[in-house]
Amino acid sequence: MCLAIPVRIEELLDEQSAVACIGGLRKTINVALLDDLKVGDYVILHVGFALQKLDEAEARRTLALLAELGQLAEAEQAAQGDAS
């Protein structure tokens, strides 16, 4: 099962790609679907694509909920593989 997870933008590479922190690892992701991204923004990541921006509070709530459900590690592993 693939989950979309919140990730933090660490570096903007160009209009289509950025580096995000996924479970403590830095991975290049596709951000072509979003406008006006800045370093520090949080996005929803699914199969290597940033789909939507969200605020930090919502990102933290979502990550905490996934961790509580025991699915965060699985989602991060899937995202790390997809973002390569």
Swiss-Prot record:
Protein name (record): Hydrogenase maturation factor HypC
GO molecular function: carbon dioxide binding; iron ion binding
Function according to Swiss-Prot or TrEMBL: Involved in the maturation of [NiFe] hydrogenases. Involved in the biosynthesis of the Fe(CN)(2)CO cofactor.
Family: Belongs to the HupF/HypC family.
Origin superkingdom: Bacteria
A Pfam family the protein falls into: HupF_HypC
Pathway in which the depicted protein is active: Protein modification; [NiFe] hydrogenase maturation
InterPro entries registered for this protein in UniProt: Hydgase_assmbl_chp_CS (IPR019812), Hydrogenase_HupF/HypC (IPR001109)
Gene Ontology BP terms: protein maturation
PROSITE patterns: HUPF_HYPC
